[in-house]
Amino acid sequence: MYSKYPAFFLNKNIKSSSGVQFSNVVKIPSAIESLYRGDNNLTGIIFLLPTLITGVFCQNFPEVVDIEQIRLHKLTNLSNDFHMVSMSEDPQIALDWGNGCFITIDPVSFSDYIVDVHATFSENQLNLPGRMEREKEHVALAVPFCSIKKITIHNKELANPFYLSIPQENHEAKMELNTLYGELISLLRKKYTQEVDEKEEQIALRTYAIRYLDFYAKFCGCDNPFDKTIAQLSELYPEFMSNFLQSSHFSSKTGLMKEIVVNSLDNLFKEHPYTKSIDASYIYRVKESTTCYEDDWAKPVYD
C-alpha cells in the first residue's frame, strides 16, 4: 500500500468536473489574476512542440481531488508520485523554486480546476508549518498552455505567443476549455495508469488536439498564432521562437503552425519527456512516499 489514508467514498460533497472530481477543497479566489510556477527544468519542457498542446502537467491524476490528495502532494517529499502542478501567488517564491526560471499563469480560464492549498488545509481544520504558509500555494493537475502569459528565464521575460486571454464573463470560452481540460486529464490518466493500444491513443490524441486548435480558431480570431507561419511568429516573438526552434523537432518548418502541429500529432506522447518512457514497469510500480504521518519534518503539525 502506498497510502495509509482511509478509502474515500463518494458523497454529496463531491463536485464533478469532466475528467476530475473535487471534494472538500477550496478553489482559487476569483480576485487572483496571476499565479507563478517555478521549475528548474523549465527550458527543457516549455518550448517543446508537444507542450503547446498538452500544457504543463503532473504525473499523478487522481479521479477525486480531496484533502487526502492535497496532503499527499504537500507533505510527501521522496518522489513525484503524488505531486501536482504547484503554483504560487508570489513570484519570488516561484523564482526560488525554479532557480530563476518560472512561468506567469492566468488562472481565470481554468479556475474550476485550481485548488487553494492553504485555504483547503484551513477548511479541514489543519495547519501548515510556517515555512509552508509563506509559499501561498495553489495546485492543479495541469496548466493549459493557452493560460501561460509569459516565461521568465534568468531575468529575461519572453511573451507567450500562444497565450489566450479569456475574461471572467466569457462563460462560453471557459466552458469549452473546461471540456478540453477534462479530456486532457482523462488522456493523461489513462496513459499513466493503463497499458494502452498505441493506435487508439493516437486517435484520441489527434481528436483532442484538433478540438484544441478549433478552440483557438473560435476565440482568437485574426490573432490566432496557429494561423501564422514560423517566419511570421519569429518576427513577432523572436526570443520565444528561437528557443522553440532549438528545442522542438518536426519534419517540416513550412506552412501554418496548425499544419505543423497536425502533422506531428502522432508523436505527442512519444516525444514528451514525461510520457515517452512510460511502460508496464512504470505503470505497475510500487509508489514510494513519506506521508505526513511518517515525515519528521511535517509530523509535528499533527501531533
UniProtKB/Swiss-Prot annotation:
EC top class, as a word: transferase
Name of this chain's protein: NAD(+)--arginine ADP-ribosyltransferase Lart1
Record's keyword annotation contains Transmembrane: no
Primary location recorded for the protein, binned into one broad class: secreted
E.C. no: 2.4.2.31
Chain's role: ADP-ribosyltransferase that targets a specific class of NAD(+)-dependent glutamate dehydrogenase (GDH) enzymes found in fungi and protists, including many natural hosts of Legionella. Acts by targeting a conserved arginine residue in the NAD(+)-binding pocket of GDH, thereby blocking oxidative deamination of glutamate. Lart1 may target amoeba GDH to prevent a conserved stress response. In vitro, acts on Glud2 from the amoeba Dictyostelium discoideum (DdGluD2) and yeast Gdh2p but does not act on human or Legionella GDH homologs.
Taxonomic placement: Bacteria, Pseudomonadati, Pseudomonadota, Gammaproteobacteria, Legionellales
Subcellular location: Secreted
Species annotation: Legionella pneumophila subsp. pneumophila (strain Philadelphia 1 / ATCC 33152 / DSM 7513)
GO cellular component annotations of the record: extracellular region
Recorded GO MF terms: glycosyltransferase activity; nucleotidyltransferase activity
